[in-house]
Amino acid sequence: MQDDTIKLLRECNAGIKMGVSSLDDVMEHVQSENLRNLLAQSKETHTKLGNITHEYLRDYHDDGKEPAAMAKMMSKIKSNMTMNEENADHKAADLITDGCNMGIKSLYKYLNQYPAAEEKIKKLAKDVAEAEETLVKDLREYL
């Protein structure tokens, strides 16, 4: 049970870090103030969820997990190449939507992979997925 709990927490931790990093990568290029505010609000939500994740990891005496270096590097390269084009708001919404969809898919994969995780940690993972789903819906008008 504890093993599944820690593994699920680590995946949540890495995913949240990746999400915050991606939001940072695109926010500076966004032209619409409304979109910038939406992304900033999502970053704040992800940061709060990340802080909760860190508290749980400390309780289990675990340092967490960093996003895969290659995935992080490829995300940054894609963001930088794409955001240098015109229609920055559309491109930002597109990139973040893709990232959210990957995050949602991964979270549910890990929820299924670690069924013995504690309920409070499963709830946290579902809260992260819900935050991603909300952002995807909110970004639709910018696609």
Language model regions located:
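Alpha-helical bundle segments that constitute or directly flank the non-heme di-iron/ferroxidase center
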Residues: 2-30, 91-115
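Short phosphate-engaging motifs
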Residues: 19, 35, 49, 103, ...
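Charged/polar positions within long, soluble alpha-helices
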Residues: 21-28, 51-58, 79-82, 86, ...
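Carboxylate-rich helix-loop segments that flank metal/cofactor sites and access channels
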Residues: 55-105
